[in-house]
């Protein structure tokens, strides 16, 4: 159960914290209804992806969530409170994972000028 995105990058949206439109934060453009088909143009978006990742990292959310997930990936309100992790931190963490995939795709495929993926709504 859950919503997935697939294409040049693949993953699962974090349950209850990440919207299907998370890719738009990193320059993805919706292509079709039903599922959301996205394209990210390297020339237009790579710099923005790097900057957005840096902004997310500067909030400390990624570090806080990584610390919480150090021993296991299970979490609840009590565990989040113990580690000082907010719902917004979880959302930032989830979006960071997607943005990192986009950056890594372009870094690992230097000849590619665009990246495609389909997100479940």
PLM features: residue spans?
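Acidic (Asp/Glu-rich) sequence patches and key acidic residues
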Residues: 1-112, 120-121
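Conserved GNAT acetyl-CoA-binding A-motif
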Residues: 115
């Amino acid at each position: 159960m859950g919503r997935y995105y697939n294409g040049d990058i693949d993953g699962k949206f974090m349950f209850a914290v990440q919207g299907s439109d998370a890719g738009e934060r990193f320059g993805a453009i919706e292509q079709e209804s039903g599922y959301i088909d996205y394209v990210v143009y390297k020339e237009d978006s790579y710099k923005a992806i790097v900057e957005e990742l840096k902004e997310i990292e500067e909030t400390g959310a990624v570090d806080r969530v990584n610390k919480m997930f150090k021993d296991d990936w299970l979490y609840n309100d009590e565990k989040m409170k113990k580690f000082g992790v907010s719902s917004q931190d979880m959302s930032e963490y989830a979006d960071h994972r997607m943005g990192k995939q986009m950056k890594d795709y372009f870094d690992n495929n230097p000849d590619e000028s665009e990246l495609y993926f389909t997100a479940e709504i």
